[in-house]
Curated annotation (Swiss-Prot):
Cofactor note: Binds 1 Ca(2+) ion per monomer.
The gene coding this protein: nrfA
Organism the protein comes from: Parabacteroides distasonis (strain ATCC 8503 / DSM 20701 / CIP 104284 / JCM 5825 / NCTC 11152)
Gene3D superfamilies the UniProt entry points to: Butyryl-CoA Dehydrogenase, subunit A, domain 3, Flavocytochrome C3, Chain A
Needed cofactors: Ca(2+); heme c
Protein's recorded name: Cytochrome c-552
Repeat listed as a keyword: yes
Summary of the function given for this chain in its UniProt record: Catalyzes the reduction of nitrite to ammonia, consuming six electrons in the process.
Length: 494
């Protein structure tokens, strides 16, 4: 017997169908509207741009909204509980870090990063690049410029990638003058997202992956992964390389470096072969729930805005905490205060572990130096140095990542906890070495309660560093700018 729907069931089915059709229609309309907006912009360009255009202001007439929001990366007014867009002297706040980086340029100067508009200025100003008075002087290679400017792909094209990397940092000072901008992430002709730095492409190739097959949503993270990653300068040519061949976890990259016999520097106190993590933001973010659910970097750091009927990406790249209504609340219904506190809770817990690890690791370096001074042999110190290397790699991997405590809180806690364990093991191993040498008392600790005391303890002449830097900024940088201006390399707002 045929079963008929009751009247109310029929109407319910009809209503449900209409709702589904309406929603699908709205989605289709939104897609078509977005496509029409993009088509309209592309068909009404006022300036034709071809090739690598490093002067960001050349894009303003075609993309005024994107350009104006990009200019806002110069803003330094936002501050959250732990970060923001202000330059904060981290060594002043955490003098233990001076000890951890003894023998490396970061012990001289390390501040929290500002927005992309400050990329060139901040690099010139940091003590880490020294004060080179000629093109062939200075402690750093030209590789250090790689992520700072759209002038980089221009010069790589002109010089060849190998030649770009192997020069001195100062040799390109007159060429790399425009801060991170349009051409770093977009093809000038059509503004499609593209990869402008070879290291990411090469890392994919070594893993048997084809980056050209990436989806549009994946590209909204991969353009960031050109720079916001762990990397190192390989060989005498200082070739920029991502250590992803074995994987992208902290242990995978450590295994890669161990196999290569690589160390960024030898620690001045402990003599441990130290790995300096850069900023493994992409790697850590991929281990978190948001990336695992398909959320891209741009979804949270460059949310869409609407103006005059036009929908566009906000190019004021910054912390999502500065715009919770357009980031977190797009998906989450909780209040701004609740969502902000959710982030702070994760950061507080990671920070607690970080503080303990920094304290123990600083002591481990000092105690290792004490053991050397007491006559310890390389064979006796072998295990100590390995443990210190492992502990510091885990500390730096977690600390150097921007936003890691939010991106992947469980992974950050695991990494820092493992680092703390390694640091404690290193201290215990040193105590055993000292006992064999006949010393069983506590190792005397120097006073490194301030940045100045810590820098003095590791032998830095900061007055000389600052004097040399001032001379460099007042003489060499103006020469670079003058030559760039004469060669028409500078954007109007630089």
């Amino acid at each position: 017997m045929e079963k008929k729907l009751k009247s109310w069931q029929g109407w319910l089915l009809f209503g449900g169908t209409m709702v589904v059709v309406f929603v699908l229609g709205m989605i289709a309309a939104s897609v078509n509207e977005r496509h029409a907006e993009v088509t309209s912009v592309m068909n009404n360009k006022k300036t034709e741009i071809t090739g690598i255009e490093a002067r960001n202001d050349k894009f303003e007439s075609n993309y005024p909204r994107e350009y104006q929001t990009w200019e806002a990366t110069a803003d330094t007014s936002f501050k959250s509980l732990y970060n923001g867009n202000q330059a904060v002297d981290v060594l002043e706040a955490r003098p233990e870090m001076v000890i951890l980086w003894a023998g490396y340029a970061f012990s001289k100067d390390y501040s929290t990063p500002r927005g992309h508009m400050h990329a060139i200025e901040d690099m010139r100003n940091t003590l880490r690049v020294g004060a080179p008075m000629t093109e062939n002087e200075g402690p750093q290679p030209a590789t250090c410029w790689t992520c700072k400017s759209p002038d980089v792909p221009r010069m790589m094209q002109a010089m060849g990638v190998d030649n770009f990397y192997k020069g001195k940092w100062a040799s390109l000072g007159k060429e790399i003058v425009n801060p991170i901008g349009c051409a770093d992430c977009h093809e000038p002709e059509n503004m499609n997202l593209h990869i402008s730095r070879p290291a990411l492409i090469e890392a994919f190739q070594r893993q048997g992956k084809d980056i050209t097959k990436a989806t549009q949503q994946e590209m909204r993270s991969l353009v960031c992964a050109q720079c916001h990653v762990e990397y190192y300068f390989k060989g005498d040519g200082k070739y920029l390389t991502f250590p992803w061949d074995k994987g992208s976890t902290v242990e995978d990259m450590e295994a890669y470096y161990d196999e290569a016999g690589f160390a960024d520097y030898t620690h001045k106190l402990s003599r441990a072969p130290i790995l300096k993590a850069q900023h493994p933001d992409y790697e850590i973010s991929q281990m978190g729930i948001h990336a695992q659910r398909g959320v891209s970097c741009a979804d949270c750091h460059m949310p869409y805005k609407s103006e005059g009927g036009v929908k566009y990406s906000d190019h004021h790249i910054q912390s999502p905490l500065a715009m919770i209504d357009r980031t977190c609340q797009v998906c989450h219904r909780e209040s701004e205060e609740t969502l902000r506190n959710n982030v702070y809770e994760r950061q507080n817990k990671a920070n607690e572990m970080r503080n303990r690890l920094e304290t123990e690791l600083a002591k481990a370096h000092v105690e290792a130096k004490f053991a050397w001074d007491k006559g310890a042999t390389e064979d006796q110190m072998k295990d100590v140095l390995k443990l210190i290397r492992q502990a510091q790699w885990r500390w730096d991997f977690g600390v150097a990542s921007h936003g890691g405590a939010f991106h992947a809180p469980q992974e950050i806690q695991r990494i820092l906890g493992n680092g703390l364990d390694k640091a404690m093991q290193a201290r215990l191993a040193t105590a055993k070495v000292l006992a064999k040498l006949g010393y069983t008392d506590d190792v005397p600790m120097p006073d490194f309660s301030t940045k100045e005391k810590a820098q003095q303890y590791i032998g830095l002449d900061m007055a000389a560093e600052r004097t040399a830097k001032e001379k460099f900024l007042n003489t060499i940088v103006p020469q670079w700018m003058k030559e760039a201006q004469e060669n028409n390399r500078l954007a109007k707002n630089i």
